[in-house]
Curated annotation (Swiss-Prot):
GO terms for molecular function: iron ion binding; N(6)-L-threonylcarbamoyladenine synthase activity. Its main location: cytoplasm. It comes from the Bacteria. This is tRNA N6-adenosine threonylcarbamoyltransferase. The gene is tsaD. Substrate binds at V131, A132, S133, G134, G135, D164, G177, N264. Its EC number is 2.3.1.234. Binds 1 Fe(2+) ion per subunit. Belongs to the KAE1 / TsaD family. Disulfide bonds: none annotated. The keyword Phosphoprotein does not apply. Required for the formation of a threonylcarbamoyl group on adenosine at position 37 (t(6)A37) in tRNAs that read codons beginning with adenine. Is involved in the transfer of the threonylcarbamoyl moiety of threonylcarbamoyl-AMP (TC-AMP) to the N6 group of A37, together with TsaE and TsaB. TsaD likely plays a direct catalytic role in this reaction.
Amino acid sequence: MWVLGIDTSCDDTGVGLVRDGKVVVNLVASQVRLHEAFGGVVPELASREHLKALPLLVERALAEAGLRPKDLDLVAATRGPGLIGALLVGYTFAKGMAFALDRPFYAVHHLEGHIAAAWPEGLPPPFLALVASGGHTHLYEVLDLGRYRLLGATRDDAAGEAFDKVARLLGLGFPGGPEVERLAEEAEEAIPFPVPLRGQEGYDFSFSGLKTKALHLVEKGLPKAALAKGFQEAAIAHLAEVVLKAAKDTGHRVLLVAGGVAANRALQERFKEAGLEVHFPPRGLSQDNGAMIALAAWRRHQRGFPPSPLSLGATAYWPLEEA
């Protein structure tokens, strides 16, 4: 069974092909250079770039797999959450393909896609899933496919957003995560940062205080590499402490870490040392992509979830618990 997945939820145009649960093609057209001059994503520009890139990317994906459109069995796309203009480009394109080919269409939640990318075939729920990216920092208890309980979320900035903002303060490129990580590796010592929300009763996250601390340190002219290292260490410690508290309280010993921040090597090492069974997405599936959307749709189809009606619209706001 061949599944085409499309993701245009933000600034990456993602097209993926999955065959019987295995990723065969995963193509991403990045808009980094376009948005770098603005220090962040400009929604209207993102939508226009998706319009230009998507048809060519779908054509290329099919060619790489040696397929014709009629060889597809399912078509899927991200319905939300995300930038509504960007979402509509991929979502309407996918619905149009499904209609023209008379194939089932699956409207996929963006965060379920990220979880699917890190979820090894055969791993039974329940378990914990941390989704940390430029737009989201959420901790879920995964009870089953399509059944999620939100344990905690960021109160302000997302983890990846904080990395981007600190990178901008340091005069680094966009996206900021890889740039901050690279600079932090150059430092022998870290400037200490306070770890947010220590002692809280729940499982929420907060990164705005770390961003403010970084601003004050930059204004003092302190070494940038040591600053980057201190910020990264505090951000990772915060993520780890909240997740480990949730693991202790719920009794879960299995954790998925998904989203763009999951590619951070220091974060991966921290979680591997935590004594949990930890799973990360394969290389290339941490960032937004279409293959994870195809994976999520394939699993839903295999479990007997009905296709989505073509009348269902895209949405910028969509809690995963309602997916």
